[in-house]
């Protein structure tokens, strides 16, 4: 498999540190608010990576962390009066529920910073003992970037007046680029944890480094195969992670670094300051998880994604075609996936997750199958193979797994659903009474509402026309 390594800035052949296995760590959310589309895109990108590696026969071990100690969380505590655990537990569950709606497979390991404090403190102490970190008078602990000759190798963009120096103010820092490993308590009201250096809390960067060392064994040269996250994390977060781990362990953190592009809303970078931050929960309510998954994955993961209604509707129409084909070949059981079709999809996804080619392969399969069914509508072998093809799409890409009528009900609000069910019940009763005039009138009323119905052995099903 070919993947794009952000450090080498080129596509490389994936060669795992342990034969047949793939270890992946993805930076998860800071859990103080609802997830936005940027969180969704990152999760979907690395879900595709995990699914592809599994389809290629690798045993994948993926970790995605939750940052549940952070200044933003503490601010939320102050604003709401709720405990830190109440806030973080609530938003972690919200995030997991929304990822499930998107079809994102759960990570094998979901570490929290609060559950990794021993590992964090141990790594900080190791860095102090090795003279890569220093404690200042107020109890803060800083990483000394001047001691790491490879600092800057990950992002290739380090300078003395970087973002770090503007964010972390302390006159006792030895270098502007030095960053906090541990932040001492600021007062009695602060949320703090005991440690040998001072009572305080960990810095953001050290949390990920320590959790990786806690849960992954590595091979003595690298701790994990792939470290992933959004492009905005490349510097300073991933640069700092790499430096800490390198100096604490004596080997590199990750063999490969992968990053997904930004999300824009109608051509502007999504951000809370611009007031165009789109919460994932709102998008899920309007479009449903599967349509959103298809759309957010329809652009290559490394490219910036411009979220707009027109492109979303175009993506939905492509997904609709798959479900219309599925409706055409059901009911029935799958046979064996078409070998050429399966290989074409695997070839596309093995080329650094080339989703555009993969979707084109699917579109071609849909068109060719429909053409064959037009000629031979009762071709059972073709129908069984098509069911298998769609099941493989669902396994590899995470869409196509719903029942067609369930899929085509997405976007219908609950009030309208309730009205439809009432009308269908009235129609059933009319048919039992052989009142076909009323039955036909109800069908026509539903058609006028934009709803089509089909009578099956299991009962009447409906969908948006």
UniProtKB/Swiss-Prot annotation:
Cell compartment(s), UniProt: Cytoplasm
CDD domains noted in UniProt: CysRS_core
InterPro entries assigned: Cys-tRNA-ligase, Cys-tRNA/MSH_ligase, CysS_C, Rossmann-like_a/b/a_fold, tRNA-synt_1_cat_dom, tRNAsynth_Ia_anticodon-bd
Binding site for Zn(2+): 27, 208, 237, 241
Positions of ATP binding: 272
Molecular function per GO: ATP binding; cysteine-tRNA ligase activity; zinc ion binding
GO cellular component: cytosol
Matching SUPFAM superfamilies: Anticodon-binding domain of a subclass of class I aminoacyl-tRNA synthetases, Nucleotidylyl transferase
Any single GO BP term: cysteinyl-tRNA aminoacylation
Subunit: Monomer.
Family (UniProt): Belongs to the class-I aminoacyl-tRNA synthetase family.
Protein name from the UniProt record: Cysteine--tRNA ligase
Gene from which the chain derives: cysS
């Amino acid at each position: 498999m070919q993947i794009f390594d952000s450090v080498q800035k080129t596509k490389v052949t994936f060669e795992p540190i342990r034969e047949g296995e793939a270890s992946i760590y993805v930076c998860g959310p800071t859990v103080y608010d609802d997830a936005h589309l940027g969180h969704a895109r990152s999760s979907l990108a690395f879900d595709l990576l995990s699914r592809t590696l599994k389809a290629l026969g690798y045993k994948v071990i993926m970790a995605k962390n939750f940052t549940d100690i952070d200044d933003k969380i503490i601010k939320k505590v102050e604003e709401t009066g709720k405990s830190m655990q109440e806030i973080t537990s609530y938003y972690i569950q919200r995030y997991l529920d929304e990822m499930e709606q998107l079809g994102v497979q759960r990570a094998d390991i979901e570490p929290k910073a609060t559950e990794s404090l021993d590992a964090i403190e141990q790594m900080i102490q190791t860095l102090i003992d090795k003279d890569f970190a220093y404690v200042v008078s107020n109890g803060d602990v800083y990483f000394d970037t001047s001691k790491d000759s490879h600092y800057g190798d990950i992002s290739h963009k380090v300078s003395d007046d970087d973002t770090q120096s503007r964010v972390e103010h302390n006159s006792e820092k030895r270098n502007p680029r030095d960053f906090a490993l541990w932040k001492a308590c600021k007062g009695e009201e602060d949320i703090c944890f005991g440690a040998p250096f001072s009572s305080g809390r960990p810095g953001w960067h050290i949390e990920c480094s320590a959790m990786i060392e806690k849960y992954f064994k590595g091979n003595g040269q690298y701790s994990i195969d792939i470290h992933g996250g959004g492009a905005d994390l490349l510097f300073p977060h991933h640069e700092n992670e790499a430096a800490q781990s390198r100096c604490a362990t004596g080997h590199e953190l990750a063999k490969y670094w992968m990053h997904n592009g930004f999300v824009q809303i109608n051509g502007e970078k999504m951000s809370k300051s611009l007031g165009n931050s789109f919460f994932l929960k709102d998008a899920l309510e309007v479009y449903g998880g599967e349509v959103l998954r298809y759309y957010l994955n329809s652009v290559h993961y490394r490219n910036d994604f411009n979220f707009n209604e027109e492109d979303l509707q175009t993506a939905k129409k492509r997904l609709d075609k798959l479900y219309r084909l599925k409706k055409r070949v059901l009911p029935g059981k799958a046979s064996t996936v078409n070998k050429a079709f399966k290989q074409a999809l695997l070839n596309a996804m093995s080329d650094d997750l080339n989703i555009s080619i993969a979707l084109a392969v699917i579109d071609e399969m849909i068109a060719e199958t429909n053409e064959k069914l037009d000629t031979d509508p009762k071709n059972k072998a073709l129908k069984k193979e098509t069911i298998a093809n769609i099941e493989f799409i669902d396994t590899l890409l995470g869409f196509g797994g719903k029942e067609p009528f369930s899929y085509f009900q997405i976007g219908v609000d609950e009030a309208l659903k309730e009205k439809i069910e009432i009308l269908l019940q009235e129609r059933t009763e009319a048919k039992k009474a052989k009142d076909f005039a009323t039955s036909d009138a109800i069908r026509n009323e539903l058609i006028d509402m934009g709803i089509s119905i089909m009578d099956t052995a299991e009962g009447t099903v409906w969908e948006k026309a």
